[in-house]
Structure formats: structure tokens, C-alpha cells
Amino acid sequence: MSAKDVKFGDSARSKMIAGVNVLADAVKVTLGPKGRNVVIDRSFGAPHITKDGVTVAKEISLKDKFENMGAQLVREVSSKTNDIAGDGTTTATVLAQAILNEGIKSVTAGMNPMDLKRGIDIAVKTVVENIRSIAKPADDFKAIEQVGSISANSDTTVGKLIAQAMEKVGKEGVITVEEGSGFEDALDVVEGMQFDRGYISPYFANKQDTLTAELENPFILLVDKKISNIRELISVLEAVAKTGKPLLIIAEDVEGEALATLVVNNMRGIIKVCAVKAPGFGDRRKAMLQDIAILTGATVISEEVGMSLEQATLQDLGTAHKITVSKENTVIVDGAGDAAAIAERVQQIRAQIEESTSEYDREKLQERVAKLAGGVAVIKIGAATEVEMKEKKDRVDDALHATRAAVEEGVVAGGGVALVRAVNALEGLKGANEDQTAGINILRRAIEAPLRQIVANAGDEPSVVINAVKNGEGNFGYNAATGEYGDMLEMGILDPAKVTRSALEHAASVAGLMLTTECMITDIPEDKPAAPDMGGMGGMGGMGGMM
């Protein structure tokens, strides 16, 4: 076991605060409409330019191990806020730094750190209740556009794109952000259910110009196994052929004799058919087949439940208005499933999302909800250079998360105003003792920090603006982008209540723990002796004269 370096009391806390300040000072330059960029060196490729707080925080690792512990604890604040709300990471870091720096003065003056923490917790609870009570619902196009624009650093085109995407696919729909190929941003919307499996054979394509198979009002056969014997399919094929409608087969795989026969029948025009592999693997494949079944009104033919493909009838098949199958994707538009059954399935998947502990699983489940309930929208980012594209993608990701948070819990006045107004809710609030009341006052002062930083980044005088905002009422605040005062909601400067709330809760949680730290322990790096130099090889003796 390696030797440990141990620090106590003020010497431990001063090191920790030094680390916190390095990280927070690097992150907070990005706050607000006039926040600056941070350039991050990469060991490969071009440097990364970003205005995203959590990206900056994740890059910081300090040489001094005690300082690094402080930095990593504050990094946890921005990461947690990012996980819960998807935005507000810079605000959370600024708040954590302010609470810690205010609190440490009281600890140094001899107050009880545990009571200070309790006081901070009481104040946070009151402020969070206040934020929830003043939040206004954000369910219209304009509010969503404004939230998206503010979060994307006052970029109105991004706000418009996100609002359009939400309008098209609904609040449950999946919106993804990808790097585009041109200079302009673009929005691609796929209505209906899309999954990433194309036709098994290109001979199923009936549109030669686009190499796709388009099926109008088709029957849909879902099979939870490989099909290689054509005899299993004959009864279904004959029944479908009599109706004159096309058929889409989704199975684990279609191969051998079965595939050859389907291709021949399709090319001769006897029956219009297309075969596709089922999406996903293992249990996820079974679940997705069931989703498609509910969406289209089909029954999954599975031997696990005692069903045989040979006995399948038209009643077991689903239908849809239109299906387009390309080499890589299948899109089912307007499935004929029962609306109540679809809603029930969506509810069921949502319950699984709540219970899931894996980020990957949650993402996949969310995609399934979107495919059943709405659709999928892809925002394609356009930029002149790769560096600019990455920076813009960071901003659009933030904006997307912010709009989702706004839809969830509503919006409050932006620009740090909601937190400054929450000071009124702390008036007259007292703790069980003087130290707890001091903790409440620590938070009262600290929650002004985001507005102070926004103003400082805009090049104005923070104390003048803070006093002016405090003298106002309601949503009256300061627009750092234009240097004007006015109603923040009318000026379109909104913050999602969830983002503001999460930032404060996580900042206070970690700052409170750091205030109550009395001892820090870290490994002492071992000095490994340098490898000794290899000695030179001895010279070879001269050879004696030959006889």
C-alpha cells in the first residue's frame, strides 16, 4: 500500500477551494449571451472550441492532488446537472463556487459547518418551492423557440429549428442532432416508425430510380424466427395474393429456398412482396417486434407462445397506409393499430424508462416511445469548418435539452432574475440556531452570483445591475445582450424551471459537503529510480598473428 498525504482543517480546505476556483473560473467565462469561448487542446486533431460548461469542466485535471479533488467535486455538480436537466451546467458551477466561497468565511470565523449546511439546505428547499410556484407552462411554439434560442447563445435559427422539430414529432418524439454536409442548418423529419433494417435482397426494390420498395396498404407478417422453408409461407402467400395487396415480411432472417421463391414471385408480379430482418437483437428484438405488432394491428408469430407460421391467417397480419423500404431503413407510415393499445404500450415503456438505471437502455426505450408516439426529427448542423461545426453542435445539444426541460416543468424569467427574485422568499426565514440562520444568509448572497457573472461577461458593472434588478418587481431584469432593462418574458429571455432548480440543488449539495470537510487524504507519488545506464561493451582483444 502506498504512503498517504493527509491534510486537516484550514490547510485542507484552502487547497480544495483553490482547485474549485481554477475549474469554476474556466467554466464561468462561458456564461450568458456575451460569454466567451474556451479552446481545449486535443492530443489528436484540431483544438476543440466550446461554450458548453460541462465540456470545459470534464477537461480539467490539476497536477496538485488536493486541488484536483476540489475541482473534481465541482465537476460532479455540472455533470449531475447535465444528466438531470441537460443544461445549466455553467450556472450550477457558478453557484457552487459562490456558496463555497461565502460559506468558508463563516467556517473560518468558527461557525459549525454542519449547522451551516443545514441552513443552506433549508434555504434551497424554500427557493426551489418558489421557482416551482412562479414557473409558467411552455407549451406553445414561441416559448419553445425562445428557450432554444437563449440556450444556444441567442441563436434564433437554432431556436426555430428545435421548435419546428417539436411541432412535427410532438413532445414525445425523438430529436437528434447530426453533423450536416452543407453550410446551412436543416431539419429532416421521419413521420411514422423507422428502424435501421433494409430489404434482404435488392430484387425486392420496385422503384429503380431510388432503389426502394414502396408498398401501398400492405399486409405485414411478423415472425420471431428464421424462415428458410417456403412451405411454411405458402398458406399466407396464397391468402394475400387473392386480395391483390402487397406483403411485408419482418422476420429474424429469410434465407435459402424461401428467399429465392419470394424474389421470383415478386419479379414475375405474382405477389408484390418484400422481406426485412427484424430490428435489434435478443430481448430487444422481441420487444421491437411487439411494438410493430401493436402499431400495425398484427400478431407476432412466435413458437414460444405455440403459434405456427403454417397456420397463420390474414387475421394475424397487420396493415399500414404505406411502407418504404430502402437498402438500410424501413419506414412504416400510419399503422392500423388500435390507438388505445398504442397508448397503453407507450405507458408501459415509460414505466420501464423510470425503472432503468442504464443510460443506454433509457435512450433505447425513449427511441421506442418516439417511434410509437410521434416520429423522429434530425437536425443537421451546417458550418464552414469542422471546428465550428463541433462548437455549434454543443450549443444545439444544450438548446435541445433546455427545451425538453422547459416543456417538462415550465419556464421562469431568465438571465439569473428568477434566482434574485427568490431572495424575497428567504425574507424572515430563520434556522434552529444562529449558525443555521447564517447558512440561510450564505445562500441568500450566493444566488446573486449567476446574474453577477452574466453582467461581468457582458462588460458591465455587476453591483449597479444587481441593485437595479432588486429594485424592480416580477420579471423585471437585465438583458445582457442589448444592455437594456425590461420584462424578461416579453424580451423572450426564459430559463427552464427544471434547469434553474437542478443547478441550485446540485450546487448546494456538493458545496455543503465541501464545507463540512475536515480532512483530505491522497496518495504520495512514489519516486521510481531511473533505470541505470547500460555499460559500454568491452573492446575485443586483438587476434594473435597467424602462423
Swiss-Prot record:
PROSITE patterns in the cross-refs: CHAPERONINS_CPN60 (PS00296)
Top-rank lineage group of the source organism: Bacteria
This protein's record includes keyword Transport: no
Chain sites annotated for binding ATP: 30-33, 51, 87-91, 415, 479-481, 495
Enzyme type, top EC level: isomerase
Reaction it catalyzes: ATP + H2O + a folded polypeptide = ADP + phosphate + an unfolded polypeptide
InterPro entries noted in UniProt: Chaperonin_Cpn60_CS, Cpn60/GroEL, Cpn60/GroEL/TCP-1, GroEL-like_apical_dom_sf, GROEL-like_equatorial_sf, TCP-1-like_intermed_sf
NCBIfam families named in the record: GroEL, PRK00013.1, PRK12849.1, PRK12850.1, PRK12851.1
Family in the record: Belongs to the chaperonin (HSP60) family.
PANTHER family: 60 KDA HEAT SHOCK PROTEIN, MITOCHONDRIAL
Protein name, UniProt field: Chaperonin GroEL
Source organism per UniProt: Acinetobacter baumannii (strain ACICU)
